[in-house]
Amino acid sequence: MTDQLITLIWIIIKIVLILVPLLVAVAFITLAERKVIGYMQSRVGPNRVGFRGLAQPIADIFKLLLKEVIIPTASSRYLYLIAPILSLVPALAAWAVIPFAQGWMLANVNAGLLFLFAMTSLGVYGILVAGWASNSKYAFFGALRSAAQVVSYEIPMGFALVGVLLAAGTMNLQGIVLRQSGGLWHWFWLPLLPLFVTYWITAVAETNRAPFDVAEGESEIVAGFHVEYAGVTFALFFLAEYANMVLVSAIATVIFLGGWLSPFQGIPGLESLFAWVPGIVWFVLKLSLFIFTYFWMRATFPRYRYDQIMRLCWKVLIPVTLVWIIILALAIEFHWTHWL
């Protein structure tokens, strides 16, 4: 009994050690986004709260927590309140299998890749429930758009993950990272470049971020599925969006950029020079690169029309991933794998 209690306490400690830094990071990612986009648009960004605006996320948190939660009269009360939780929980649960460094993970699951794909697909249910329960036509339109978009883009994303599975020969995320040992040119981003690009486009679409944010098109459907939400409930949707953004960036880091592995492996001189850098530092740096591309895309691209988004998925991404999977399967079958 004592051993079971110690194991349970240790698991809880590990969960806290994962979730607390994640939630703090999400808060400051919102500030980083506003600052980066501000500089891209020749603005300063938030600079009033604290030194150079560094306390802005804290002010935003208090503002959201102190606002009243107003439940629409004709809404389905319980579904309305459950919807934000349905969006947030999968985004947090998926972190259980993400390896931050060698052995640094909550659960070393052999079907980790499958678990991640399942978790990233569940968030849409919260959006659907929110659109239905709000009893608002704008919220419902936004929810339907989001459902169609996420279900469509799950197909090319799934094909991209199948390509990684073929190349690595395992669904264990730690095994996938170790399969990429050897340096920058051994990571899967290069031999699986079309799948890498496809994964990243689908990741942006799955998280409903610009330029794929038609689910909350302010100019068309007044913020979409969370138009009737305020205060804490809106904050949970906001948190879920950014937690998903960090999650898909972490997945891309693990399956395409070698996770915690140093980019200087196999390079004489540089490998020993940077040998002191912990693996988790490389992991965070790679993840930050993907987060930056989210900001860059939001500042650069206009929102696509709904038909353009669907056409990109069904007529471009799905055929590209299918062709590359066939090429990869043939290469493995005939042992032309020197490029992997």
From Swiss-Prot:
Domain of life: Bacteria
Major location category of this protein: membrane
Keyword Disulfide bond included in the entry's annotation: no
Pfam (any one): NADHdh
Gene Ontology cellular component list: plasma membrane
An example Gene Ontology molecular-function term: oxidoreductase activity, acting on NAD(P)H, quinone or similar compound as acceptor
Residues of the signal peptide: none
PROSITE patterns cross-referenced by the UniProt entry: COMPLEX1_ND1_1, COMPLEX1_ND1_2
Bilayer topology annotation: Multi-pass membrane protein
Membrane-spanning segments: 9-29, 81-101, 113-133, 158-178, 184-204, 221-240, 245-264, 273-293, 316-336
GO BP term, example: aerobic respiration
Location within or outside the cell: Cell inner membrane
Broad EC category: translocase
Nucleotidyltransferase found in the keyword field: no
Subunit record text: NDH-1 is composed of 14 different subunits. Subunits NuoA, H, J, K, L, M, N constitute the membrane sector of the complex.
Family affiliation: Belongs to the complex I subunit 1 family.
Function per UniProt: NDH-1 shuttles electrons from NADH, via FMN and iron-sulfur (Fe-S) centers, to quinones in the respiratory chain. The immediate electron acceptor for the enzyme in this species is believed to be ubiquinone. Couples the redox reaction to proton translocation (for every two electrons transferred, four hydrogen ions are translocated across the cytoplasmic membrane), and thus conserves the redox energy in a proton gradient. This subunit may bind ubiquinone.
Protein name as it appears in the record: NADH-quinone oxidoreductase subunit H
Native source organism of the sequence: Coxiella burnetii (strain CbuG_Q212)
Source organism phylogeny: Bacteria, Pseudomonadati, Pseudomonadota, Gammaproteobacteria, Legionellales
